[in-house]
Amino acid sequence: MQKYLPVLRSCPFFTGLTDDEILSILHCVSAAKITRPRGSYIFRAGDSTEVMGLMLSGSTLVIQEDLWGHRNILSKCSTGDFFGEPYAATPGAILNISVVAEEDCEILLLNVKRLLTSCPTACDHHQKLIRNLVSVLANKILLFNDKITHVSKRTTREKLLSYLSAESIRQSSLSFDIPFDRQQLADFLCVERAAMSVELSKLQKEGLLVTKRNHF
């Protein structure tokens, strides 16, 4: 795990921990590294899990799919991001999301049940890690609240402007990249891609924005 320490140090989950403490914690939570090719499922809706995933490399999409193949993207996870935390922290919870590899990726699986029970080595940094987990979960709630704000808008135009405005504020810049391609953005905002493309074209003609691929 030594080679992944630069990634782990940057994660909010490990904030305030030394390298030795991080390595000790990985042992406590039965950390296991897996690799998955593009298009494969890491978690499937309908299953349950005791582990959460930490992206070491590559990217994944957290999605919801119905029986007719309609897809709703909840979030995109890149290097250093987590997925599955709420389900792993809730014993017996059934996943209503799936996690799919957007590209070849390396993932570290962490057993949250081991974290939430008494640490067998009684490590001093165990409580700090639990506080960090609470912070990670709270941040995830804020991200989903943002999505609700965007998709609750009445029109495709309003959804686009809500999302792009929020991204501009988040990145503190009027020029920014978004993590989605056009189809993914449509799936994230729960709109039809064709209708979204029409609105983007109108917004450009009106001088409200300039866009090329995922850059605005």
Outline where the language-model segments fall:
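A small-molecule sensor/coupling module
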Residues: I22, L95, K113-T155
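Cyclic-nucleotide recognition modules
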Residues: I73-R131
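Phosphate-/nucleic-acid-contacting segments
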Residues: R154-F216
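Cyclic nucleotide-binding regulatory module and flanking cytosolic helices
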Residues: M1-R38, Y87-P91
